[in-house]
Amino acid sequence: YVDGRGNLTPSEGTFKFLEDIFNRTITVQPDDVLPLFGILERYNRITNNDFIVASSFTYIINSKSQFFERNFSQLRFKIEGAGSLLNALTATYKVVNTEGSTKNKLFGVEYAQYAKAEVDFIKHFPIGKQSSLAFRSFLGVAIPYGNSDNIPFSQSYFAGGTTDNRGWKAYRLGPGASGSILDYNEANMKITLNLEYRFPILGALKGALFTDVGNIWNVADDTR
């Protein structure tokens, strides 16, 4: 898998290698086929072109009156819609897809169409003079419809990481309702609960005990 000069071509060479495996030009062990297929599936998902025209509305209720206030709560609502305007324009002006696809395209790219809603609640309250308890809950769901069968990768949810389910690296947890073999797990619904007890140790050194509960799921979405 080298070019005319004998140099390795990582990108093209990878695809030629996978193509030879799937065409059975190269023989591999059956247990190795699934991970190799996962590489190709992951690449196609992450690099897929998406044309997104969206509008959103966010409403936040925050009881915090001072920057260093320890007892406060915040409730955030967000709704977002994408693709409805483009769908109306293509229907009004009778834009014809000449490529034989069942999906409408603009500039040669299928436009995304989905509805998304999120609610996020945070509560901090003091326990004693320097200790505090922090709670956070999050629910988000994005449903594709019309011109889309799945949510664009950039608009999907993932679990894990330093501010999420901290027992897993980012994108390594879930989906809860899928047999995904991908390293970058993502889905269109997420539920998370976090509870953290923060306390002083010595001077400016602080400590925390926490528990994280949550996962991601594929709901009305054909992503695997």
What is the meaning of each model-derived region?
Residues 1-2, 9-10, 41, 54, ...:
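C-terminal transmembrane beta-barrel domains of outer membrane proteins
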Residues 58, 62, 196-197:
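Phosphate/ATP-binding catalytic cores across multiple sugar-kinase/actin-like superfamilies
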